[in-house]
Amino acid sequence: MSEKMVAIMKTKPGYGAELVEVDVPKPGPGEVLIKVLATSICGTDLHIYEWNEWAQSRIKPPQIMGHEVAGEVVEIGPGVEGIEVGDYVSVETHIVCGKCYACRRGQYHVCQNTKIFGVDTDGVFAEYAVVPAQNIWKNPKSIPPEYATLQEPLGNAVDTVLAGPISGKSVLITGAGPLGLLGIAVAKASGAYPVIVSEPSDFRRELAKKVGADYVINPFEEDVVKEVMDITDGNGVDVFLEFSGAPKALEQGLQAVTPAGRVSLLGLYPGKVTIDFNNLIIFKALTIYGITGRHLWETWYTVSRLLQSGKLNLDPIITHKYKGFDKYEEAFELMRAGKTGKVVFMLK
């Protein structure tokens, strides 16, 4: 193994990132070193690249970016048990304390002292990465790296879609970005019908149809609530899944969901949102779930089994694959323009 590696690094505050050569890190106690086989770009990585207000408050350059990964364990630090060199793995990004009130109740996904791998630590946009052993997930060999790297965001989609009954339910999904597209795949694999998708981008509406959406709506040109009511014989959808983070989409979805329906919210909003709580939530007796992270480790088992079932239609979602990191700037600019689904760097 070489002593040097290439990595995409946020070297300083400001727009962009740099491809640099750095030392291969060494795993410390309770850590493992993985060789990266595939890694994918998340919206969080784009925020760091663009250096938005959140990134400015959270990221401390110089730092290697990236957190979605499939890799192979190549070295084990002191005190690590249950993991071996050669294991094919992915990484849960929430580094939890195990001691706070939430953790002691088994609610690790809302740990009060969470650190995020690849946000608060160096990440996986590199040939090698050091990972806390407690965050390692072992993959079946049958799952290819370009799918295995998607398990972390797939976990977000699974928790959103499967927060309540979904088989045989009518569903409205607002937002067909990468997470929304994964939500479509999970909903279809889980027996939802019809799956209706509201998305303003022509490119993403086409992707939504390829993934399996039964109906697509352009919210800039069509009345979303009217279209949903027409499709559902005036009843509204059983389940509303909000992936966009757009306040208008939230309002439309709450109007379009049937009384006593279920709502799952994953999209993050730009600020405070004004909602008619009385008429859109209370009098409709809606059940609402806020979604963050993934349930450790229940969601990972669900994601892995869905992948092994072969029922998830992920190929249309992976719109761009790059061999190595050389074209990382092109990849990020395409994502900024909304011209991608998931972008994967292949290092195998």
UniProtKB/Swiss-Prot annotation:
GO MF annotation, one: NADP+ binding
pH dependency: Optimum pH is around 10. Below and above pH 10, the marked decrease of activity is observed: the relative activities are 50, 22 and 55% at pH 9.5, 9.2 and 12, respectively. Is stable over a wide pH range: upon heating at 50 degrees Celsius for 20 minutes, the enzyme does not lose activity at pH 4.5-10.0.
SUPFAM superfamilies reported in the protein's UniProt record: GroES-like, NAD(P)-binding Rossmann-fold domains
E.C. no: 1.1.1.103
Involved pathway(s): Amino-acid degradation; L-threonine degradation via oxydo-reductase pathway; glycine from L-threonine: step 1/2
Catalytic activity entry: L-threonine + NAD(+) = (2S)-2-amino-3-oxobutanoate + NADH + H(+)
Cofactor annotation: Zn(2+)
Biophysicochemical property: temperature dependence: Optimum temperature is 70 degrees Celsius. Extremely thermostable, the activity is not lost after incubation at 100 degrees Celsius for 20 minutes.
GO cellular component assignments: cytoplasm
Group of enzyme by EC: oxidoreductase
UniProt entry tagged with the keyword Oxidoreductase: yes
InterPro entries xrefs: ADH-like_C (IPR013149), ADH-like_N (IPR013154), ADH_Zn_CS (IPR002328), GroES-like_sf (IPR011032), L-Threonine_3-DHase (IPR004627), NAD(P)-bd_dom_sf (IPR036291), PKS_ER (IPR020843), Zn_alcohol_dh (IPR050129)
Cofactor binding: number and manner: Binds 2 Zn(2+) ions per subunit. Contains one structural ion and one catalytic ion that seems to be less tightly bound at the site. Zn(2+) can be replaced by Mn(2+) or Co(2+) to some extent.
UniProt keyword terms in alphabetical order: Cytoplasm, Metal-binding, NAD, NADP, Oxidoreductase, Zinc
Site-annotated residues for Important for catalytic activity for the proton relay mechanism but does not participate directly in the coordination of zinc atom: 152
Compartments in which it is found: Cytoplasm
Ligand binding (NAD(+)): 179, 199, 204, 266-268, 291-292
Binding, Zn(2+) 2: 97, 100, 103, 111
Main function: Catalyzes the NAD(+)-dependent oxidation of L-threonine to 2-amino-3-ketobutyrate. Is much less efficient when using NADP(+) instead of NAD(+). To a lesser extent, also catalyzes the oxidation of L-serine and DL-threo-3-phenylserine, but not that of L-allo-threonine, D-threonine and D-allo-threonine and many other L-amino acids.
Family: Belongs to the zinc-containing alcohol dehydrogenase family.
Note: The enzyme shows pro-R stereospecificity for hydrogen transfer at the C4 position of the nicotinamide moiety of NADH.
Subunit structure: Homodimer. Homotetramer; dimer of dimers.
Record's protein name: L-threonine 3-dehydrogenase
Lineage of the organism: Archaea, Methanobacteriati, Methanobacteriota, Thermococci, Thermococcales
Gene name of the record: tdh
